[in-house]
UniProtKB/Swiss-Prot annotation:
GO terms for biological process: fatty acid biosynthetic process; lipid A biosynthetic process. GO terms for molecular function: (3R)-hydroxyacyl-[acyl-carrier-protein] dehydratase activity. Belongs to the thioester dehydratase family. FabZ subfamily. Keywords: Cytoplasm, Lipid A biosynthesis, Lipid biosynthesis, Lipid metabolism, Lyase. Its main location: cytoplasm. One of its GO terms (cellular component) is cytoplasm. NCBIfam families: fabZ (TIGR01750), PRK00006.1 (NF000582). It comes from the Bacteria. The active site is at 49. It is found in: Cytoplasm. This is 3-hydroxyacyl-[acyl-carrier-protein] dehydratase FabZ. Involved in unsaturated fatty acids biosynthesis. Catalyzes the dehydration of short chain beta-hydroxyacyl-ACPs and long chain saturated and unsaturated beta-hydroxyacyl-ACPs. It is an enzyme of class 4 (lyase).
Amino acid sequence: MIIDITEIMDLIPHRYPFLLVDRVLEIDLNKSIKGIKNVTVNEPQFTGHFPARPVMPGVLMVEAMAQLAAILVAKSLGSTKNKEVFLMAIENAKFRRIVQPGDTMYIHATIDQQRANVWKFSSTVTVEGEMAAESKFTAMIKDKS
């Protein structure tokens, strides 16, 4: 099931310049999701990170992983219109390859555990078949107040 940017914006609240998932390529409800982020030089982080050699910040790669996981949660629950997804913890984040404008980040997130409103994930980012980043993280789903 491919999910385009319009549906992504219906599923998660993030918007430019902080929407970091361009398309979902594959989803297996309650299990895993694959998506992409096309990295372009026009993104605001590259004006300062770094002007002479733009490099995608590692923290934004982790954020892209978390946003993709939030899409998986929304689709698995049927809707998150009355809910909010909050990142609680990031564990074992590792960055193995520079990501720069012109690259396509292939993001994969897998649910490791889900108990009540707490979800644990493992996620990776690859570029041109090479591991660029990996992380484990925990998110909490809460009712909107």
